[in-house]
Amino acid sequence: MRSPARVLNSLTKHSQTTEYRFERLYRILFNEEMYYLAYQRIYAKPGNMTQGADGETIDRMSLPRIEKLILSLKDESYSPQPSRRMYIPKKNGKTRPLGVPSFDDKLVQEVVRMVLEAIYEGHFEDTSHGFRPHRSCHTALNAVQKTFTGKKWFIEGDIKGFFDNVNHDILIDILKERISDERSIRLIRKFLRAGYLEQWRFHGTYSGMPQGGIISPILANIYLDKLDKYMKEYATGFDRGNRVRAYREYEVLTYQKRLVMRELKTATNDVERKVLVNRLKEIDKARSAMPCFAPMDGNFKRLKYVRYADDF
């Protein structure tokens, strides 16, 4: 039985070949050590002690339970339970729906998440910052600060109700571009269709994926990576020019500054030097109040893009 590190490293290595198709992913779910690692990763996270629809928490793990879970995966009798829907308050006074999976589903989802991350993480665009290792809303804000400083036009987008409206068929088709393993695809579809319980009433899910599901963030990034790559391609056709034209008034002041500095080097008395220094201060003040490049240069265009989850 291979260690989880070797399994995941092998997946990452194969994923570097764009044409490679993964055919036997499902058997990774038969590796007990993958569940030990999954347990370690999710045990200490806030919220994982919350009861799912089965009324059990993650501290009830045992080897016999894992063995039973693996057997149900082998014969594909495993069926995810509906998540328990609860509502989390937001800063604006509204609430956000959160689906709490059962204990067994958390374990299986974490194993699937690790597998998908090993395959896809290296192919996501640098413009994507949500739900990724070593990335966060802070790295997204830093990217905005560095990339958008001095820009005149902004388009802010929020995909309304994204997690509730993801098209399952489109998502499955995207997964099939790299995964040629029907059992793995069927398992992911089971998670998407598991539904949820709200006030002990079952609701089917024919689109979307539950916020709170462990595999939902990686599936969201796989889905929205198409948007990221489209924007990258669109920017290639949108961008124009190699260098933005300098602002004429700024260039004039820069030339005047060079002349004054040249005179300052040859000034012979304090009165003359004081006059020139004051002139330099006036020029610098005027320069700082205007852009150094033409703000609306029609011959130079750039499109920049940053995404965090369903906000871009």
What does each model-identified segment do?
Residues 1-312:
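Non-catalytic terminal/accessory segments
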